[in-house]
Structure formats: structure tokens, C-alpha cells
């Protein structure tokens, strides 16, 4: 099985003119679906009763997708309820590149134009937390995203955690 590993970050200077909205939530629902069971004193790596798989990331993708899709939909709805913007104002959506199915959900369920949702997963795979900044930089470098564009970032993480930001680039 191919594995990907990467790291990336984007640095933004806080300016009231450009950061329009930011939100992060964590829910315990589904926490057992994305976790590393080992570590600490409970399943210490050197404990003879600890198995190798206890110290590896474990995920039930289909189950966590169902929960994350519903939570993401609510986060999208709340973003536009809590701001003066609407979906049509968004130039580009830069989502976590979890899977093609997850990316397409921003069009199907989030009701964003499919052409406005940045998709690099077919070239990079799921690079976990690095996928959002990687997708952003890719779209800037290839000329899709330009200064003045309204960008909606949204990402998920184990736990289940989710964050979004609405910025003018």
C-alpha cells in the first residue's frame, strides 16, 4: 500500500480586512474511529502486552466520513449565517484532501460550484494536515487563486475536529 507523508504550512498576517471568519470545533462523536490507541502508560510501546497495531493510527474511513460530512455541512451553513457573505461570493474552496468522495461532497452537499473546489488528491493522496496548505499553494502557483479572491478553507482532523476560515487572499 502506498503511503504518503508530508508537511506544509501557510503563514498569514492577521488583518481585519482579510480574515473574515474563523471557527474550530471538536466533537467526541466518532473519536474512536480515528485514533492511536497506544502511548502513555495505558499501552506503553515498551510494555510486552502492547501490540504494534496499538501504536499505529487507526481509522474507520467510511464511518468517520459519514459523521464528518454532516459536521462539515453544518459548518458551511453556519459560516454563511454568521457572516455577510454567501456561497456565491466564494472564489475558491480549499478543503482537506481526504478523498475524492470527501472533496466532491463540498459540491454535492455544500452546494459549491464543482469548478470552485480545489482538488489535488489524485496527484498527492491524503497528506493529512498538510493537504490544505498544499492544495492552496498548488492553486496559487498554477494561477487559479489570485490576490483579491475570497477563499474558504475547511479541514478535518482526528478526534473529530474541524476548522474553517474565510479570507480574502
Question: Model-predicted segments: where are they?
Answer:
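Claisen-condensing/thiolase-fold acyl-transfer catalytic domains that form or cleave C-C bonds
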Residues: 69, 73, 91-169
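Conserved active-site "lid/cap" helical segment
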Residues: 39-91, 101-111, 135, 139, ...
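Short beta-strand segments
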Residues: 10, 23, 153-157
Amino acid at each position: 500500500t502506498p503511503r504518503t507523508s508530508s508537511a506544509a504550512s501557510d503563514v498569514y498576517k492577521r488583518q481585519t480586512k482579510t480574515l473574515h471568519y474563523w471557527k474550530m470545533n471538536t466533537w467526541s462523536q466518532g473519536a474512536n474511529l480515528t485514533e492511536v490507541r497506544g502511548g502513555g502508560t495505558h499501552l506503553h510501546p515498551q510494555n510486552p502486552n502492547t501490540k504494534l497495531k496499538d501504536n499505529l493510527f487507526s481509522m474507520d474511513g467510511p464511518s468517520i466520513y459519514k459523521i464528518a460530512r454532516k459536521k462539515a455541512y453544518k459548518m458551511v451553513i453556519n459560516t454563511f449565517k454568521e457572516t455577510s457573505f454567501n456561497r456565491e461570493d466564494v472564489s475558491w474552496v480549499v478543503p482537506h484532501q481526504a478523498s475524492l468522495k470527501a472533496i466532491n461532497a463540498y459540491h454535492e452537499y455544500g452546494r459549491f460550484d464543482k469548478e470552485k473546489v480545489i482538488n489535488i488528491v489524485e496527484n498527492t493522496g491524503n497528506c493529512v494536515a498538510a493537504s490544505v496548505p498544499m492544495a492552496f499553494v498548488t492553486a496559487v502557483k498554477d494561477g487559479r487563486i489570485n490576490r483579491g479572491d475570497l477563499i474558504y478553507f475547511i479541514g478535518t482532523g482526528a478526534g473529530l475536529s474541524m476548522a474553517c476560515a474565510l479570507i480574502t487572499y
